[in-house]
């Protein structure tokens, strides 16, 4: 009898387990639905529910709730607006086997048994679908989504990740991790941005802050998956005609990037132990003595007396206010680091924070968590999710601002030493939740406080903050850098690590980190033989010149200033840096576009050429804006570079006259003093004179290089300008100067459009200079129908920064250029160059 009872119990237990197991591995059947304005909720026979909310005609929020409660612990840290446009009242068309919802751009089909979601475009092309009967699975707190994987589908995104840009065949985790000297295949890294895009013209943003995972065909060639170990399974499907449109809608959800001060787009110098007044003066004088442009000098963490009292270290800084004023007079801004902790050695501040309850708690004992830290001893971790902390921290960080610093770099915000293997950190309890939920957004909450307190206490001043650890939405508060990139055991052999930074930077841009940099020279490794590293250093600087926030940085007291690597390396580094400064009007115009759309300055090739599958694997080159193609040399000893040119005609930017047809791979010469670059035919590139620093001259002549389009076509560019340091760009205080060049069978018609923007004006007069690259020289030039005086190049350039009454032109057949000088009066002018 006991045997029968036992066997019967085992039988029912096995059956129950089988039913339970089945429930976890199959999505239930849809039995009913309810609708409310934008949302439709579908109820399944396993007690789960799935809600679709139309954010716009092309964006759908999908919420899988295993218990049907649709409750979340915290509002979204990333999404600031999900009602993107009026979609009216959602109408559900019920049929025998499915439900359908239509928008002007999408057809959404929900099959009933089992629940299976499919999304089509308006032309009935299937874009996205649940995989078979396991689209939505739960197992305890763990939730998984399985989606159909097409044979020709490719994936891009997930923010700052190593490896190839095409994510297909790879798996990734989101867990902000301190990975010093990380390799070319390291994951996870410092930032978590669970947003990716498919070549089927959709994007997915998983709005979950836990340690989520993404597997793009690593488990099966038939499906890909994403999962979360806790929290809610909420994600947004975003449809667009191309990647740019998808990214713009993601920005609409998560907020526009702030614009950096213009000076931040120049060059910056740093090193790990750049933490003294004496060294700061030496570096500043070294740059100015040699005429190498530089705008920013960083001070690393050792600038403080203690973490994080924001007091200048005694003995290192005799008179920091005077130092900052002197450096400002030399054209330098100073940026200092901050860590998100209070050292226990900093007794007064630690006791204050502990007494006020401003430190993250240890859930096992209720006391402030005792956090080991890479320097400064054990620390308390500041709880930036607690609202009262903001003003307290803001008052401390204001002290060096009042002394004269220009900004911060927020370092170690993972927080450091809390990588996924360090599970003992999970006992940390923040005001808004346990550490498994808050870890990935910890840096984001800190960045938010730093930015908002900066603006609160420094009205109308543009914040500069560069961060290492963050989450989706960071673009609202901060800028980025790619952390402590490695060089390997031998710093002179760090070629692979340098090459790796190109896809890492491009990947960051796809995660809406348009303003970023790597540690130029690589963070790790002692440099014992500077001549032996001269070639690698040169190539680092050449690649780094196209980082939006170019910063030279290295660990410890390893000096990495350009003049230390030999005369040739210094000369080549200076040339690369000067190129960036000449391009600043172009760069700043694209900085405005980044603010408006989220599009990065450094762009993967497929962002501009989404239909060209060859661009999916071009990880060693990139577009810089829409007009310039850059292919840095990243191999030791290489004096040429294999480059892919997409559709169109491409002109070698290093000689301005050699043209190549697109849609081909080609090998181009790349001696040590050359960065392989191409400009697309039909482009206008605005430039400024090289300066020691970006605002050395408040007003200057702008030169427009024009590479005319083919006959019958026109070339356009709209130059963007503003004050560069204030928040006027948010209030419409900026101006645009539209330039158009039309190619005809008689010559070229250049139109300088009326300057737009009444709220901002130039601080002085200037000349506009034009350089048209052409093989056929015009014989006559007319300004608004009147003949223009012809002159020589010397006269054309004479007094161009002080004399604003001369209009003249100069055809130069030898150089293949047609030059024009025109005083900038802000009015429309038509210039005809006639053969």
Question: What are these model-derived regions, one by one?
Answer:
Residues 6-27:
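Bacterial Sec-dependent N-terminal signal peptides
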Residues 22-263, 270-272, 276-285, 296, ...:
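N-terminal accessory segment at the very beginning of proteins
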Residues 812-816:
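Aromatic sugar-binding surface patches on proteins
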Residues 1-5, 450:
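Short, small-residue-biased leader/transition segments that mark boundaries at the very start
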Residues 16-19, 587, 778:
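N-terminal processing/targeting junctions
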């Amino acid at each position: 009898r006991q045997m029968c009872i036992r066997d019967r119990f085992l039988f029912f237990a096995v059956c129950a387990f089988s039913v339970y197991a089945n429930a976890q591995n199959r999505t239930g059947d849809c039995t009913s639905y309810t609708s409310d304005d934008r949302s439709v909720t579908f109820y399944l026979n396993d007690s789960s529910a799935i809600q679709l909310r139309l954010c716009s005609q092309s964006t759908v929020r999908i919420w899988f709730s295993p218990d049907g409660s649709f409750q979340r612990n915290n509002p979204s840290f990333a999404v600031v607006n999900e009602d993107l446009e009026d979609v009216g009242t959602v109408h559900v068309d019920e049929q025998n086997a499915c439900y359908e919802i239509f928008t002007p751009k999408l057809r959404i089909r929900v099959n009933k048994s089992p629940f299976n979601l499919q999304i089509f475009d308006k032309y009935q092309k299937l874009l996205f679908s649940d995989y078979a009967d396991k689209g939505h699975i739960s197992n305890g707190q763990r939730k998984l989504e399985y989606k159909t994987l097409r044979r020709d589908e490719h994936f891009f995104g997930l923010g700052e990740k190593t490896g190839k840009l095409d994510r297909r065949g790879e798996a990734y985790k989101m867990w902000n991790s301190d990975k010093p000297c990380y390799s070319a295949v390291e994951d996870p890294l410092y930032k978590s941005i669970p947003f990716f895009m498919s070549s089927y013209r959709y994007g997915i943003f998983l709005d979950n802050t836990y340690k989520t995972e993404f597997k793009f065909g690593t488990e099966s060639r038939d499906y890909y998956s994403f999962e979360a170990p806790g929290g809610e399974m909420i994600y947004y499907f975003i449809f667009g005609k191309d990647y740019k449109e998808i990214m713009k809608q993601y920005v609409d959800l998560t907020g526009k990037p702030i614009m950096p001060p213009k000076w931040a787009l120049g060059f910056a110098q740093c090193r790990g132990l750049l933490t003294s007044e004496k060294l700061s003066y030496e570096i500043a004088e070294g740059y100015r003595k040699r005429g190498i442009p530089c705008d920013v000098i960083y001070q690393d963490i050792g600038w403080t007396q203690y973490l994080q009292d924001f007091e200048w270290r005694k003995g290192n800084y005799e008179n920091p206010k005077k130092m900052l004023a002197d450096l400002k007079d030399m054209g330098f801004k100073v940026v200092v680091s901050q860590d998100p902790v209070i050292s226990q050695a900093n007794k007064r501040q630690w006791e204050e924070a502990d007494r006020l309850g401003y430190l993250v708690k240890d859930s096992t004992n209720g006391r402030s968590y005792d956090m080991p830290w890479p320097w400064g001893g054990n620390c308390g971790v500041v709880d930036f999710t607690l609202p009262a902390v903001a003003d307290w921290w803001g008052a401390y960080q204001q002290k060096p601002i009042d002394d004269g610093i220009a900004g911060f770099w927020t370092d170690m915000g993972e927080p450091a030493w809390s990588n996924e293997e360090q599970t003992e950190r999970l006992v940390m309890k923040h005001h808004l939740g346990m550490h498994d939920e808050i870890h990935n957004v910890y840096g984001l909450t800190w960045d938010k406080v730093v930015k908002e307190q900066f603006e609160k206490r420094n009205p109308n001043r543009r914040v500069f903050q560069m961060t290492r650890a963050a989450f989706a939405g960071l673009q609202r508060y901060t800028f980025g850098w790619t952390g402590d990139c490695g060089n390997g055991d031998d710093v002179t052999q760090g070629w692979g690590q340098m090459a790796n930074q190109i896809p890492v930077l491009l990947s960051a841009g796809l995660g809406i980190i348009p303003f970023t940099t790597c540690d130029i020279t690589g963070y790790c490794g002692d440099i014992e033989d500077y001549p032996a590293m001269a070639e690698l250093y040169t190539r680092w600087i050449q690649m780094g010149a196209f980082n939006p926030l170019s910063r030279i940085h290295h660990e410890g007291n390893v000096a990495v200033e350009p003049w230390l690597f030999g005369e040739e390396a210094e000369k080549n580094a200076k040339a690369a840096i000067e190129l960036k400064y000449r391009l600043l009007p172009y760069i700043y115009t694209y900085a405005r576009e980044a603010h408006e759309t989220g599009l990065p300055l450094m762009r993967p090739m497929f962002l501009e050429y989404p239909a060209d599958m060859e661009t999916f694997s071009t990880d060693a080159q990139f577009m810089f804006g829409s007009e310039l193609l850059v292919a840095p040399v990243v191999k030791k000893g290489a004096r040429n570079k294999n480059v892919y040119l997409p559709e169109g005609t491409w002109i070698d930017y290093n000689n301005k006259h050699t043209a190549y047809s697109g849609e081909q791979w080609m090998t181009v010469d790349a001696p040590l003093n050359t960065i392989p670059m191409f400009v697309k035919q039909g482009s206008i590139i605005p430039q400024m004179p090289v300066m020691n620093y970006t605002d050395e001259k408040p007003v200057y002549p702008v030169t427009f290089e024009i590479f005319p389009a083919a006959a019958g076509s026109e070339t356009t560019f709209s130059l963007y300008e503003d004050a560069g340091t204030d928040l006027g760009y948010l209030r419409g205080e900026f101006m645009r100067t539209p330039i158009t060049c039309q190619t005809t069978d008689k010559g070229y018609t250049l139109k300088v459009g009326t300057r737009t923007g009444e709220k901002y004006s130039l601080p002085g007069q200037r000349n506009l200079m034009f350089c048209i690259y052409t093989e056929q020289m015009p014989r006559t030039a007319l300004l608004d129908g009147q003949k223009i005086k012809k002159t020589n190049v010397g006269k054309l350039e004479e007094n161009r920064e002080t004399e604003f009454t001369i209009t003249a032109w100069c055809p130069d057949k030898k150089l293949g250029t047609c030059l024009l000088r025109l005083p900038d009066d802000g009015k429309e002018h038509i210039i005809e160059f006639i053969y």
